[in-house]
Amino acid sequence: MLSSQTSSIFTVSRLNQTVRLLLEQEMGQVWISGEISNFTQPASGHWYFTLKDDTAQVRCAMFRNSNRRVTFRPQHGQQVLVRANITLYEPRGDYQIIAESMQPAGEGLLQQKYEQLKAKLQAEGLFDQQHKQPLPSPAHCVGVITSKTGAALHDILHVLKRRDPSLPVIIYPTAVQGDDAPGQIVRAIELANARGECDVLIVGRGGGSLEDLWSFNDERVARAIFASRIPVVSAVGHETDVTIADFVADLRAPTPSAAAEIVSRNQQELLRQIQSAQQRLGMAMDYYLANRSRRFTQIFHRLQQQHPQLRLARQQTALERLRQRMGFALEARIKQANQRQQCVSQRLSQQNPQPRIHRAQSRIQQLEYRLTENIRSRLSEQRERFGNAVTHLEAVSPLATLARGYTVSTTTDGKVLKKIKQVKAGDIMTTRLEDGWLESEVKSVTPGT
């Protein structure tokens, strides 16, 4: 009987070897959770310990080249998650596991799920920059998806009220923690998209542990954010908290308060920009008028240096054209300033900062009135100077001298007769009077005494 079954008889060594190969080949690498006990670390640097639960235990070894990658010091009674290979120690026939990695259970398990989902969604392209939607600038209505009783909502509303009190805010209250939270967050995102009331959404909550923030690592929430037609700003926890929602969102804010800062405009800054624009407009007008005044002065000096009537008439015509161009340019600038002011007023009216806008408009009107009066005064002054110049030029004109009874006599070769030695008896000379010329013959020359 024994002789017929000798081929099935194992030695102890062969049995242990066969069992080891079966365990290693069939089981492969597995994840095991349990409580650490009997932890030791000899001089070799290897770790030896037992993993147990309420009803069973198994011996474990973790060699030095693997345990040096563990980021914490295992303690007796600590719950851990171990990735290990199943094997058999042949000399004693002891079944054991060889650990390759170790992490705390609870958060460690969640971290593993987090990494797996992150890798999956990244492979699908949900994190790609090409899918990110730009945020509206400025936002006309902000939707907030968070708990209606949490500190995050209070922080968001406080920042929005401080920066842009006229900005409409719609709250879509949801749970942000617990088993029902992911579904509620998804429904809130879908509702906001269906109603189309907002042009940007803030999705988030305050800080907490990994378990507290786990709703924002849910695949359903990630896909709802990715599918949203409205740009989404994630604002989950603190700056060091990074969730799957942060990777999928169009923009990640480090905190809920920072998200409110991002989607809102600072009205104080807007008013400073308006005041700066007014100042630049005033400086431009002053420069324009000063430049035209210098040009007018140059023309006036040139008129003084040239002979009167014909050139004076041409310059007067050119001056009139210049005045008209100045008037047209001024009207165009004022019209442009009015248009800009109306545009700014219209934009501000949508944000409802009425008292400040009224004050700004009143200031602009005062500046326009003062500018117009200043230009009129300068034009009147220049006209007066121009009239005085004409009067002066007419006073020194040779024609005016003739009109007072004086005459100018010239010899036959056209030279002006200044002394008697230029003529002699019998010479012919021409005399210019106010209304014409006469020709006379010199009868005699008598020197003066």
Swiss-Prot record:
Q: Which key words are in the record?
A: Cytoplasm, Exonuclease, Hydrolase, Nuclease
According to its UniProt entry, the protein's GO biological process terms are:
DNA catabolic process
Catalytic function, reaction form: Exonucleolytic cleavage in either 5'- to 3'- or 3'- to 5'-direction to yield nucleoside 5'-phosphates
The superkingdom of the source organism is Bacteria
Location within or outside the cell: Cytoplasm
Its top-level enzyme class, in one word, is: hydrolase
Q: Which InterPro entries match?
A: Exonuc_VII_L (IPR003753), Exonuc_VII_lsu_C (IPR020579), OB-fold_nuc-bd_dom (IPR025824)
Q: Which GO terms describe its molecular function?
A: exodeoxyribonuclease VII activity; nucleic acid binding
In short, the EC number is 3.1.11.6
Q: Which CDD domains match?
A: ExoVII_LU_OBF (cd04489)
Give the GO cellular component terms, alphabetically.
Answer: cytoplasm; exodeoxyribonuclease VII complex
Q: Which family does it belong to?
A: Belongs to the XseA family.
HAMAP family, alphabetized = Exonuc_7_L
Q: What does this protein do?
A: Bidirectionally degrades single-stranded DNA into large acid-insoluble oligonucleotides, which are then degraded further into small acid-soluble oligonucleotides.
How the protein assembles, per its UniProt entry? Heterooligomer composed of large and small subunits.
Cited NCBIfam families: xseA
The name this protein carries in UniProt is Exodeoxyribonuclease 7 large subunit
Q: What is the lineage of its organism?
A: Bacteria, Pseudomonadati, Pseudomonadota, Gammaproteobacteria, Enterobacterales
